[in-house]
Regions:
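ASCE RecA-like P-loop NTPase motor cores
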Residues: 1-301
Length: 305
């Protein structure tokens, strides 16, 4: 789709300016042009993008970006915090591990990352790698060892799999419902060889079709964090571009989060965040004129020194 748009000299200059560790401020940016420039960075420069924001998913920006790039933009979610305590939602934990795994594989991604998620520690790459299981048809997998390995990953053995985080064993079949998946999977074994993998409906238990492979992530993030933690941005490739989607909203969000997150052990300071981000190219976007931006921009830049 982008091939249909002529690239002006000013946009060409913008793309050339975006080198390693560069820093650009774009004021009075509407959602459409912002999405268009982001898509150009992704397609023309072949660089992954992290969209850092202080608000919930900005549908105008993200919807336009999905149209320009012809891909779904996924959100890296944060834990839910209620009464100054984290809630451990299996869907959120599963999605966090899934995205981290893709980033570690150097996949060129566009990820939407709320400020709260950016300030939360993640499991170190080494710990995550040790706790991911992969399954593929026509591969060897020790049947007995697999059954023994599932409870330490947080999976509960039941007679019938109906919810995420459960597994069941019947003869040479193992049913597993990964915490990041919309459907559970049924593995059929012949000895220690996986001969077939099928998705199935947890209500009817009927098969929904064959799949060639799938990954299984842990359900317990907290215990893994105690074994080794790092920041989200350590998973990114050096050529990643970090786009600050509306500086004013990011500053407002941090003012709201600061008191709550500072008391929790698995979140770090915004000062540490901005120090980490110095190794990436950064684009600061705002809908306001540069005159109104100056106070917010100066305040945020102060955290980088």
């Amino acid at each position: 789709m982008l091939n249909d748009f002529p690239i002006s000299p000013s946009i060409s200059h913008f793309l050339r300016t975006l080198g390693d560790n560069s820093e650009i401020v774009l004021d009075k940016m509407l959602e459409g042009p912002k999405a268009f420039l982001s898509a150009l960075i992704y397609h023309k420069l072949n660089r992954p993008i992290i969209i850092l924001t202080g608000v919930e998913r900005s549908h105008g920006f993200i919807d336009n970006l999905e149209t320009f790039t012809n891909r779904k933009i996924e959100e890296f979610p944060a834990w839910e915090i209620v009464d100054d305590s984290p809630l451990f939602n299996p869907d959120i934990i599963g999605k966090r591990f899934e995205i981290l795994s893709r980033l570690k594989a150097n996949s060129k991604e566009i990820i939407f990352c709320p400020l709260q998620a950016a300030l939360q520690y993640v499991v170190s790459p080494e710990i995550l790698k040790q706790n991911i299981l992969s399954f593929a048809v026509n591969t060897e997998c020790d049947f007995t060892k697999l059954i023994a390995s599932l409870p330490p990953l947080g999976y509960t053995k039941v007679s019938l799999v109906v919810e995420k985080g459960q597994f069941a064993v019947r003869g040479g079949l193992i049913d597993i419902f990964p915490n990041h998946s919309l459907t559970p999977y049924r593995l059929e074994f012949f000895g220690d060889e996986i001969t077939e993998i099928r998705a199935f409906d947890p209500e009817s238990q009927q098969s929904q079709g064959q799949v060639s492979h799938f990954y299984l992530f842990p359900t317990d993030e907290l215990s893994l964090l105690k074994g080794g933690k790092t920041d989200f941005f350590s998973y990114l490739s050096p050529d990643t571009v970090v786009i600050f989607d509306d500086l004013l909203s990011i500053e407002d969000k941090y003012s709201t989060l600061h008191k709550t997150l500072s008391s929790l052990p698995f979140f770090f300071s915004v000062e540490s965040l901005f120090t980490t981000l110095k190794k990436f190219s950064r684009i600061y976007c705002t809908t306001s004129p540069i005159e109104k931006l100056s106070v917010s921009y100066t305040h945020l830049r102060a955290h980088e020194t």
